[in-house]
Regions:
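A short, well-structured juxtamembrane/interface segment
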Residues: 1-18, 26
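Non-catalytic C-terminal accessory region of glycerolipid acyltransferases
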Residues: 3, 12-14, 37, 41, ...
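Catalytic core of membrane glycerolipid acyltransferases/transacylases, capturing the structured
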Residues: 16-73, 96-106, 136, 140
Length: 173
């Protein structure tokens, strides 16, 4: 669904990285799977599950859909690789973050430490940011991918202020 927004993002990327803004909303694993099955190379930053068997099972399932996993602790090097591969990078930003990796933004009226990685990557790489979510329809196992309008990241020359502003805009989606 919303193919026009998707095409706008791909065109804006001019063959480079596209950042997919998402969160742990609905069956977000299906969102990643759907993009991979449509032939778009997908990369995803993830935190290993506490249970190694479950972690391996999820890793294998994601790999079958063409998803390349970037471990949270080693993601920086992987993101540089994605820049060269011109793929999609999916970053769910809705998890609590450390002071070192995040910035505090308003989340439903409450200050919340939010990972600023997407804002930093968008600002440094000039990559378009596309909000995308998956929504279940009714009681059947039917889902619809919702792609929202591209978010332009503003650059003022003050990197930290730009990161703060962009992260707040992403969180508001």
């Amino acid at each position: 669904e919303d193919e026009a927004w998707w095409q706008e993002a791909v065109t804006a990327a001019r063959g480079s990285l596209v950042l997919i803004l998402s969160g742990h909303f609905g069956n977000w694993e299906l969102l990643v799977f759907a993009h991979g099955m449509r032939g778009h190379p997908v990369h995803m930053v993830h935190r290993a599950m506490a249970n190694p068997r479950v972690d391996r099972w999820l890793h294998d399932l994601r790999a079958r859909a063409g998803t390349r996993m970037l471990g949270k602790g080693t993601a920086a090097g992987g993101v540089l690789g994605v820049l060269h591969e011109r793929g999609l990078l999916v970053l769910p930003i809705d998890q609590n973050s450390t002071r070192r990796l995040g910035v505090f933004v308003d989340f439903f009226g409450v200050p919340a430490s939010t990972n600023s990685g997407m804002a930093r990557i968008a600002l440094r790489a000039g990559a378009p940011v596309v909000p995308a979510f998956i929504v279940r329809e009714g009681w059947r196992a039917r889902h619809r991918v919702r792609v929202l309008p591209l978010i332009e990241v503003e650059r003022s020359g003050d990197l930290e202020a730009d990161v703060q502003r962009a992260t707040q805009r992403f969180t508001a989606v």
